Amino acid sequence: MNTKIILAVVLAIIVVAAWAVNAHRNKGFKTVSPEEFGQIIGDTATVQLLDVRTKEEYEEGHIADALLVDFYSYNFEEQAAAKLSKEKAVAVYCRSGRRSASAAQKLVKLGYEVINLDGGILAWQRAKN
């Protein structure tokens, strides 16, 4: 009987762990490599590019044609809604990919289709060199 209980507990732990991993992966947006991101943003008819870094970071260098909405601003969602169309996907990036992943989650909740740059502009710059 103890073997059955232990087996049931182990099975329950595996099921919960698998669910947690799947929930983490299914964030509502896609994260892509710099190479794939470059292909995606080339289609400006269907994609809009969003930089969610600070103004200072943006001014130090950004991907051409990127709109700026600072993720740390108190009204990020309002600014994003004012600048972005829900008719086009949003390709989002930041410095390292963390901020843009958080921004992507917020944008998905607002109804946008979102593509996140894995590794941010740092990975983008490494891929271009």
Q: Could you tell me what each predicted segment is?
A:
Residues 93:
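Short, surface-exposed ligand- or partner-binding patches at beta-edge/loop junctions that are enriched
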Residues 2-40, 47, 55-89, 98-129:
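Rhodanese-like catalytic fold shared by cysteine-dependent sulfurtransferases
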